[in-house]
Amino acid sequence: MKNSKKALLCLLACALAVTGCKTQKEPAVADNAMLVRSTQTLDSLYAHYSAPGTCLLRENYPSDVEGYTATYLASEEQKNRPNLYSYLWPYSGTFSAVNALIEATKDNKKDFGNYQKLLDEKVLPGLAEYFDTRRMPKAYASYIKDAPLSDRFYDDNVWLGIDFTDVYLMTSQENYLQSAKLFWK
């Protein structure tokens, strides 16, 4: 019996030595470097792709709307009509990116607040430009609502639903929950 208690205590001591006793996670240098790079990437995206006077982003950089031909579109009519703004799919990536930065800075009130402000004042107002209420069910279209009707891809909408759900879970703000519910009816 004494040997089993001794062995158990030895095992417990070894486990504590291996795992350590700290309960709070210290930020790793690599995590901070990745956060800095992520912020620089997002800042660069907005510096080079922002469409002046809007919350929208350009489709390409440098932006040459008159001389640009999209070779990946299905029809000649689409190919020869330049888009002033990006499609929903690349634009919605900013929502996911800002959500990731909100999550990464949850322990830093200032940075967390700055990213949430960016989401509320730039990303979501731009995203609203893609919200199609002309057809039912209401959903996000592949291109802005002021243009001729465009396709609505339900996988794009599901990703937006996930992003709204994620930001609600991080902030507990009701407006994000209401937006998320649109996708999960």
Where are these regions (language model features)?
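Bacterial Sec-dependent N-terminal signal peptides
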Residues: 1-29
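Functionally constrained cores in energy, signaling, and assembly domains
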Residues: 16-17, 94-95, 99, 151, ...
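Low-complexity, Ser/Thr/Pro/Gly-enriched N-terminal "stalk/linker" regions
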Residues: 21-147, 174-185
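Hydrophobic/aromatic-rich effector regions of fungal transcription factors
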Residues: 142-148, 159-169
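Mobile, glycine-rich extracellular loop/lid and propeptide segments
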Residues: 151-164, 179, 183
